[in-house]
Amino acid sequence: MSQIIDQVQAALQNIDKELEKYPALKELEKQIPVPKSYILLGFVGFYFILIFLNIGGIGQLLSNIAGLVIPGYYSLLALETPGKADDTQYLTYWVVFATLNVFEFWSKAILYWVPFYYLFKTAFLLYIGLPQYGGAELVYKAIVKPLAQKLVNIQPHGGPSDSLKAQAQSAVDAAESHVPQGHSTGVSH
């Protein structure tokens, strides 16, 4: 066992000697008291974990756990509180989450080639799902709401039905203005 440890330490020393060529690593080693070889091995290990997260179904599974379980738990808690702020936070989250999933569904063939996609997606879902960041509201106001207003005609203080009702009433009023006095249009208010 001690032979293996000696061989590993010798290999790490050789790596340290090779890494002496890079001033950035030397500076990093001064700032944090960790040998350059450990920094490199940590980076390589982290790199392979990221690759692992993006291969097969495990990346998608971990991302969905972060996107469903954690906000789902907070949503259940929010339903039991008397205030409305946390309800709004998670209703906004679920709208953003659904929008992301629709986008992801239609672009999965492209997203497959994005390196570390599931890692970025997981970080994004945690950002929008955890209440301390308020990311869902920011993403909703910056992206989803303007898109929804264009596509679905959502008005700030009324739904699509209010807008349609106002348009219909405007059309009735315009039609009535063209009907001579004393004649009925057959439309009641």
From Swiss-Prot:
Stretches assigned to the Cytoplasmic side: 1-35, 79-88, 128-189
Family listed: Belongs to the DP1 family.
GO cellular component term, pick one: Golgi membrane
InterPro entries (UniProt xref): TB2_DP1_HVA22
Transmembrane segments: 36-55, 58-78, 89-105, 109-127
GO BP: any one term: endoplasmic reticulum tubular network membrane organization
Protein name, per record: Protein YOP1
